[in-house]
Amino acid sequence: VPLSIRIEGEPLADRGDSELWRHSRLRWLNSTLGISDMPTQPYASMTVSKNEVGCLGRTVSIDEPTGLPGQIEAWNTEILESPVKFIIRTTEGDKELKGSALLTEQTNGHVSRSWKAEDNDLIVTCRSVMEFDGWMNYVYTLTPKKTVEVEDIRLEIPVKAEVGSFFLGAGLLGQETPQQYNGKWDAAERKVEEPGISLATSKEQHGLWPFDSFWIGNAHAGIHCEFRGSTYSGPLLNLYRPAYPESWYNSGKGGFSIRKEAGKVQVTAYSGSRTLEAEKPIHFDFAMIITPVKPIHFDRQFTDRYYHNGPKPTPQAEDLKAGIRIINMHEVNEYNPFINYPSVSYTHLTL
């Protein structure tokens, strides 16, 4: 059907933004802002020097035979007591798979590598990326050449004792790192030999389910680690519960452990026993971010005061006298009446 459209009149200087009923500002949904690979302030461009990859304040030394971090340094503090290990344990013992980490891409915003090794049983590949804010992602693919009986596939992160002072996640509330701990994906296991551990006890009271991630460290250096899957990256809200990544969860066999040993805190994510069938790949996906992600301004802990009142975002005189300097602006109020429709009345935000 032939169709012709004739548009008359002069273009609006503000594209119709002054008339809210047009919802013209929804064009921000098509914005390309933020998808550039250029680091935003205060971040800096990525650096690569031999086996070291760097971002703002942090450096990762790659263990060439495994492609995993051999050492992680945050703001001049070394985090690891020894290299991170991804272990495949069969009935014949731990696999000694060694390859070489190849640089596949380097831009201002990220550095990517690939790694591959194989033996008579398995082909193992890994794709890794580190981004300018210190986020790292490792995706392992295990392809069996034949049926393989596996006792465990696990990730071990050995953190220096002086760094691993505090722990949050994997079923634990924020606390001093316990001497030892054993937890599962969906239900914390309290044991008599684990005194002094603060556990989440109710799915209604705590938004910690599922126990898919943790942070360990102190104010100066630390690691957050998240265990992911091909269609799973952990819910940001507790309104929905996607299926766990079967590689790590393994029908409930997977879990977490903490052990304080001489000079280190060993954090382990294990998946338990399984049968790997020939030519059927399985993926193990995990991400880490090195903390702090930016320089810490400790003085702001004493000078910045926040105000949050969703329906009434205007602080009163007594609030200002108390030192309020920053207002958290929620939606559905006189200044921000529509969710996902940013600052339609920004001229009223001068208090």
Can you name each region flagged by the protein language model?
Residues P2-R6:
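C-terminal edge beta-strand
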Residues G9-P281:
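Beta-strand/loop-rich accessory regions of lumenal/periplasmic or secreted enzymes
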